Regions:
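Terminal amphipathic alpha-helical/low-complexity segments used for targeting or macromolecular assembly
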Residues: 1-40, 45-46, 52, 87
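Structural signal for interior beta-strand "rungs" in well-ordered beta-sheet cores
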Residues: 34-150
């Protein structure tokens, strides 16, 4: 029945979009991706996700985003045209045209703008915003730097 749905209103567009999103999510789960709540995960048709990735609620993977094995994404995370290596942890983060190498972490509430590169094991901490910068292997960008930081 879903193969012949028409789109003549915003309501019908939402219904057809939901059908397609379920198909995309089910295909990824069949390939070994874990979704805690598939109804709260949005994956664009061009995103690539390796097996053993865990997607938590409120995740959006847009454009040509790629996620490497054993990474955990979310909750509340939007990645657009972003490359994520193996074993990364990204929570409550927005990343646009960024690259995270293996074992990098971001968040909570990090904003990785275009040109951001987190090298292997690097961390962008809480409330950090980075643009057109490379964070070296094992380096950390904390939310506070200086005398009163802990």
């Amino acid at each position: 029945a879903a193969e012949c749905l028409g789109v003549n209103s915003r309501i019908q567009l939402a219904q057809v979009t939901k059908v397609m999103q379920r198909r995309i999510n089910h295909a990824h789960m069949a390939a070994g991706v874990t979704m805690v709540d598939p109804d709260q995960v949005w994956i664009g048709p061009d995103a690539k996700i390796a097996q053993d990735v865990e997607l938590l609620p409120q995740v959006m993977l847009m454009g040509t985003t790629e996620i490497g094995e054993d990474s955990v994404i979310g909750p509340n995370t939007r990645l657009t045209d972003t490359k994520v290596g193996r074993g990364c942890v990204i929570e409550e983060t927005v990343a646009i045209e960024a690259q995270l190498d293996d074992a990098a972490t971001a968040g909570p509430r990090a904003y990785l703008r275009p040109g951001t590169h987190l090298c292997e094991g690097a961390k962008a901490g809480t409330h950090v915003e980075i643009k057109k910068s490379t964070i070296g292997r094992g380096s950390k960008v904390p939310p506070h730097v200086g005398q009163r930081s802990k």
